[in-house]
Amino acid sequence: MASILVLHGPNLNLLGTREPEIYGAETLDDINFRLTETARQAGHHLLTLQSNAEYELIDRIHEAKKEGVDFIIINPAAFTHTSVALRDALLGVGIPFIETHLSNVHAREAFRHHSYFSDVAVGVICGFGSQSYELALQAAFSKITGK
């Protein structure tokens, strides 16, 4: 059984009400429930954290190393374009990760086109709404099992 950590960055706690035309109508609880069930059915353990505070996400990444987490899925949200500290934390623990976004960041404002994570991520999935997380989870399963 593998352990997978899903990290949700700032403002994702507002899913379901924040700009639903961009982010969809599903809540973060809906997404987390579905991911947890999918992981359980595949025989894996899923952990989640949403935070609007960069340091809390960094601390959780550090804890993940101590806990033996096998894989991270992260939607850094607005931190995608600003956080060298989160990038360094992910590199520092050496846990493979997938960068995920609900919207297609490359079809949005120019400042959203740059990511501090994509060049060091196993992969990037964006633009599929909440399905982006499900696709990332399936990719994580494949990487973990080598299939």
From Swiss-Prot:
The record marks 18 as: Transition state stabilizer. Substrate binds at residues 75, 81, 88, 102-103, 112. PROSITE patterns: DEHYDROQUINASE_II. It is an enzyme of class 4 (lyase). CDD domains: DHQase_II. Its EC number is 4.2.1.10. Belongs to the type-II 3-dehydroquinase family. This is 3-dehydroquinate dehydratase. The gene is aroQ.
